[in-house]
Amino acid sequence: MFLGEYRHTIDEKGRMIVPAKFREHLGTPFVITRGLDNCLFVYPQSEWDKLESQLKELPFTKKDARAFTRFFFSGASECELDKQGRMNVPQPLREYAKLEKECVVIGVSNRMEVWSKTLWEDYVSQSEDSFADIAENLIDFDL
């Protein structure tokens, strides 16, 4: 399971150190793709396979299904860690997520997310006040 928040940097070649606690969960290969909210989603191959199966079931006759699967799959890239525990973030994905030097890597249960430091800080500050309301609307059990 992916848990926690980590601050990292991306070098000029687009390489980023993956938190040590996440490396064993990622395995090799793994998949990185465009996520929602201008972040990147990173999935272990087993989780990607499950997600792919679910998305393949969407009716291609529906415009939204076609748009989402195009967005999601066209940005996907299979990756492996190098010997230093780094992954290479492809340039188009760095541009999509507005990744420059500083980034934030967060664990979200079955996936890892990579955020621009600025976008993450903005997201957290905007979401803090509404977190209780979101929980009330979505969760039917005590936290």
From Swiss-Prot:
The record's keywords, sorted A to Z, are: Cytoplasm, DNA-binding, Repeat, Transcription, Transcription regulation
Pfam families for this protein: MraZ
Q: What GO molecular functions are on record for this protein?
A: DNA-binding transcription factor activity; transcription cis-regulatory region binding
Alphabetical list of HAMAP family matching this protein: MraZ
Per the record, the similarity remark reads: Belongs to the MraZ family.
The record's subunit annotation is: Forms oligomers.
The name on file for this protein is: Transcriptional regulator MraZ
Organism encoding this protein: Shouchella clausii (strain KSM-K16)
Q: What is the lineage of its organism?
A: Bacteria, Bacillati, Bacillota, Bacilli, Bacillales
Q: Which gene encodes it?
A: mraZ
